[in-house]
């Protein structure tokens, strides 16, 4: 706890203190309104002594953000901070709960990384936080956003939003227990009549937390409707610690719009990442392109002509394996050889975008996502090939999707996860959204019984697609 703050601040209704502009459609529908500013996502963010660069965060998602997916996202580039699946504090302290402990497994190349915990007992939360610190995590985070009934009924996740004094006790206990930065992710309130996000953010700052993240929906909203970005702006007005915005970021334009309209210090992306794992890379490229342009004069950023080399890049770009990770160059990869092909499959991609949305809901048996929920949203931004700003970042070709699926599968196999086949089904489905004929492939994948069978179906489908030959998803 910070010196001079010996008690939890009194709880009052925060709604009267919030800026009264949510009737402004340009603010409540930012993705539909488009970008009206040149402001970009910050290049760095300091959370305590941890430097996040760029200021983008992979949200914690149950069933998704295990060590394989986190490293997969990290290798693609552009993500400044990754977070674990939300994990029961009580579970990690039980000796026999190996599943909960598996959630906290990570590798050195995942830094900086934050562990997210949920629970309602201050002493248990403090002990679990000490364990997290001892394991080498850079930050520890408290989940106050999960709307799942089984979590809420135990007074965890968003269930605690109805009891701010109890939250204050957890804040104080955890802050006193660890030296690493302590953060919190929460929703705006239980419902529209109980908006507590501003008061909660002030409480967090008073108790010495290093940053706050808001999913700009209430628990009652679940994942429906549009995220209320004005609540993020209200929190930013109320506190001096970093504020991370979360909710309805589907594109680089959305990310920049959130920063411009709320003043938030970083953006957090959850449900878009599984179906569009390159979104962090796209945001980094987009912001680099916007920053490089003469935006103060109103000049539109220019795009390197297809077939010409951007600074530091050779002209020949026929492979998906590139030489460097340079966001200003619009091409590049990481040490794992992941990246985007420059233009080889542009016509295929345009037809794919014309036929299917990239964020089509997944198979009904998709996993629970904790606070992030299933992959669907009422607000969807369609990337258009005619949009000048969308040309500032790479769009994945079918060859890219194919390579990413194979790379992710190989990582799952090497990690020997007990649910590897299930995860292969989930992510193969997500990665193929937007590909013509993908629905048939997804059905075939779901019916597959083994990893080799899934791999065979994916291989036959994509090899035929890349050869521009129609093929059935049935590979029997």
Regions found by a protein language model. Give the residues of each.
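Non-cysteine beta-strand/loop elements that form the S-adenosyl-L-methionine
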Residues: 84, 138-147, 206-216, 269-273
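Intrinsic disorder/low-complexity segments
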Residues: 1-41, 287-396
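Glycine-rich, positively charged N-terminal anion/phosphate-binding segment
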Residues: 43-46, 61-138
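Active-site beta-loop-alpha junctions enriched in small/polar residues
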Residues: 61, 87-89, 118-120, 145-147, ...
